[in-house]
Amino acid sequence: MAGNRARIAVDAMGGDHAPNEIVAGAIRASEELDVDILLVGDRPSIEASLQHHHPSPNIEIVDAEGAIEMHEGISELRRKPKASINVSMDLVKKNRADAVVSAGHSGAAMGAATLRLGRLKGIDRPAIGTVFPTLLAGKSVIILDVGANVDCRPKYLEQFALMGTIYSQYVMGVEQPKVGLLNIGEESSKGNDLALATYQLLENNKTIPFIGNAEGRDVLSGRFDVIVCDGFVGNVLLKFAEAVGEIVLQIMREELPQGWRGILGTAILKPNLKKLKQRIDHAEHGGALLLGVAGVCIISHGSSYGPSIFNAIRLAKEAIDHQVLDRIKASQENPTPDSVQASVEK
């Protein structure tokens, strides 16, 4: 493997379609992206999957014993120290890998990252950030937390807003991100105790470009670049958005005329349908970034196929290339917008 390329540890045993689809996505990433891949898991199973692809010099297998199954609790992390997700996190901890991608048990991925990598200084709770498309073509919004913390304190949401701002600015390329707090109304007086207290924190924090509350109708409007909420609300929002995307695609398929008219119509609309799918299909986004731990971790959907794993690896590479971890660290050490960039670029 090359020395200066990004090294991504991929949990080959995690997900509904492991290891075949995980390997397929990893192989494609090794060929199309400037990355080296460490496939972590059961060697015979991984080797059997690799036989369906052309050999790649950028692929290495790292042995692990078993996985944390979807029906198991995160307590299994301690009982299975050599499970694929634990070994993957250890590779980052030992500087053998720069990031982890897993489509396995999301709770286990979060637990392993927190236990083995630890939290970044100044971050009380890691958050899962997911990128959503908006009504404005080419513009997305990152929403966090979408599942790591079902109960939150105001200061947690304040930290989420800071991490989301950094991600939006440096990875998504938004020069001046606009941050919103998900709430039941635009007015600062609206919401429960958590929302009211968080609003005051965000409004008084001059390092966060907070512009006010975001109602449900604003989430995909393109008005906001970052939206923060607790993990309970965020996870419901995530699952609902995924379902709506699938329903829209299914309705479009059903409503296309049958027979030769349908064939002709599909041919004409194919480029537009492809663009629509790219905008609303969760597989196109690859996964969610676990922000706040001392390592780049991407949590993919459990039902991920090869294309989604490829996009998850691409997402991990973008986080590495844009020094997301270093920028979050700098924001805690020097809490001003300008010092974040200066500290990283020294």
From Swiss-Prot:
Involved pathway(s): Lipid metabolism; phospholipid metabolism
Transmembrane segments: none
Full protein name: Phosphate acyltransferase
Signal peptide: none
Top-level taxonomic group: Bacteria
Enzyme nomenclature, EC number: 2.3.1.274
A single MF term (Gene Ontology): phosphate:acyl-[acyl carrier protein] acyltransferase activity
Family matches, as Pfam families: FA_synthesis
Gene3D superfamilies recorded: Isopropylmalate Dehydrogenase
NCBIfam families in UniProt: plsX
Alphabetical keyword list: Cytoplasm, Lipid biosynthesis, Lipid metabolism, Phospholipid biosynthesis, Phospholipid metabolism, Transferase
Family from the record: Belongs to the PlsX family.
Organismal lineage: Bacteria, Bacillati, Cyanobacteriota, Cyanophyceae, Oscillatoriophycideae
Main location: cytoplasm
Gene expressing this chain: plsX
UniProt function note: Catalyzes the reversible formation of acyl-phosphate (acyl-PO(4)) from acyl-[acyl-carrier-protein] (acyl-ACP). This enzyme utilizes acyl-ACP as fatty acyl donor, but not acyl-CoA.
Class of this enzyme: transferase
Reaction catalysed by this enzyme: a fatty acyl-[ACP] + phosphate = an acyl phosphate + holo-[ACP]
Subcellular location: Cytoplasm
Gene Ontology BP annotations: fatty acid biosynthetic process; phospholipid biosynthetic process
InterPro entries, sorted: FA_synthesis (IPR003664), Phospholipid_synth_PlsX-like (IPR012281)
Gene Ontology annotations for the cellular component aspect, listed alphabetically: cytoplasm
